[in-house]
A protein has these predicted regions:
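A short hydrophobic beta-strand segment most commonly corresponding to one strand
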Residues: 103-106, 171-187
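Non-heme Fe(II)/2-oxoglutarate
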Residues: 1-73, 82-84, 89-91, 117, ...
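Residues in well-ordered beta-strands of folded domains
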Residues: 17, 82-84, 105, 119-121, ...
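Short edge beta-strand segments in beta-sheet-rich domains
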Residues: 11, 78, 115, 141, ...
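Short, solvent-exposed loop/turn segments at secondary-structure junctions
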Residues: 21, 111, 125, 160-162, ...
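Short beta-strand His + acidic residue motifs that chelate non-heme Fe in jelly-roll/DSBH
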Residues: 92-95, 162-170
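A generic structural micro-feature
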Residues: 75, 96-100, 169-173
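Catalytic core of non-heme Fe(II) oxygenases with the double-stranded beta-helix
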Residues: 86-155, 186-196
Length: 201
């Protein structure tokens, strides 16, 4: 007897390849060394490239509004944006993005086959018992390795923990632009209504 599996809940991760008009403006900016992030780091790089910032907001808004939430009039903005560089090949520790709704990572420069994929941890894996599956499926996987190629941008919910493994460094530095997004304007309903335009009076 075959038991039907119902995909009750899914976690959307959006992926699209962008052209040179998105990639080239970022290549002249120095990134943050992956393990030297501090309060002096530049977390607002897109404020220096307002046209690109507008394009990315428009791209994300179309994705989240038309394909995920079906809320065509909801507005969003990018809060923080920063370029990271890994010149040593050291692994990136697992983390998520606080004070953010969605996030993205954009591989705007050359990618080497040695560069490891970004891996997302499955937040729905039960704690305690661990029966190891013999075959990995969407129903039992503990992590998901996102695709990695030049020009690719990945949109994901900010609560997802993610990391990448260590690798042997090459002349091609692993670079990416990270962005955080939040909804703005009015959203919600009833006593859960929020209008960001009134927060500061």
């Amino acid at each position: 007897m075959n038991i039907e599996i119902l995909p009750a809940f899914t976690i959307p991760i959006g992926v699209v390849k962008l052209g040179p008009e998105f990639c080239e403006p970022l290549k002249k900016y120095k990134g943050i060394e992956q393990f030297e992030v501090n309060k002096e780091s530049d977390f607002y790089v897109l404020d220096k490239i307002p046209d690109l910032k507008r394009k990315l907001i428009k791209l994300f808004s179309a994705y989240i509004n038309l394909q995920i939430l079906h809320t065509p009039n909801q507005e969003y903005t990018i809060t923080t944006s920063w370029i990271t560089e890994n010149t040593t090949g050291k692994p990136m520790g697992s983390h998520n993005h606080c004070n953010s709704y969605y996030s993205s990572v954009f591989y705007f420069d050359k990618v080497s086959k040695e560069h490891p994929a970004l891996e997302f941890a499955n937040p729905r894996m039960p704690e305690g018992f661990f029966v190891e599956p013999l075959r990995t499926t969407l129903s039992n996987c503990r992590s998901f390795a996102a695709p990695l190629e030049e020009g690719l941008i990945i949109f994901f919910p900010s609560y997802l923990y993610h990391h990448h493994k260590g690798y042997e460094p090459t002349e091609v530095i692993r670079k990416s632009l990270a962005c955080n997004y939040i909804p703005i304007g009015m959203y919600g309903q009833g006593d859960a209504t929020l209008d960001t335009r009134t927060i500061h009076g």
